[in-house]
UniProtKB/Swiss-Prot annotation:
Domain of life: Archaea
Catalysed reaction equations from the record: heptanedioate + ATP + CoA = 6-carboxyhexanoyl-CoA + AMP + diphosphate
Name of the protein: 6-carboxyhexanoate--CoA ligase
GO molecular function, one term: 6-carboxyhexanoate-CoA ligase activity
Amino acid sequence: MFSLKMRASRNGKHVSGAERLVTEEKIEEISSELIKRAMGHENGVPDFINLKIEKVTEKINNLKHLEIKTVHSTSKETSRVIARNLLKNELEKYYLKNGKDIEKIDELIDFAFKIIDEGNMRGAAILDLDGNRLETDSNRGIRVKNIDTTDELSEKILGNSSLSERTVDAIAIATKVVNCGVISELCTSDNFSYTTGYIATKDGYFRILNLKGNGEVGGRVFFVENSKIDELYDKLENMPVIVY
């Protein structure tokens, strides 16, 4: 297997990114797809594209995908209340477990929404239960690498007219993240016109319509229980995962 990583930017700002794990015979085909994806991105034609291809020598981990649950909402305000409640329900367990004041959860979630609404991070922010940023580079964030889905899962998702390639990408990331020990994930797309976001927990991948407004930036935040940041970075970046 080979890892393909595409990153595209314009004037130093992130435009597009994607990860694939493929067999040797599919390298050329998938490389072409990734470049076309970068060049056709709605956020603008990039002036820089990096495509990195590496042989994967580690054992591939096969993970069952999180259950996909779609939450319908017609307004950003309602969607954010729904997202907040999903996050609070999950985070509260860990606050109580660690003897922390559950009244502080709202502040943590407020901070997370502030981060994603500012946008322009290449990767995800990481917040512990006290609201500390744990990324080694707060501008870059952390990127989840060495991931893909099986063809069968991809075809199943794309067979649903309400889902898209973005769902395929997101379910791969969300499934790996939760299996690496992240409590929950909050995400909105960096595609300006794609307003569906999601919350991921061990209970599922919750697609929430209208989690951001049309034309707005997006971002990603991981909530974690402890500060074993080096171990988390290693898993998220280096552990090869195929989601089925």
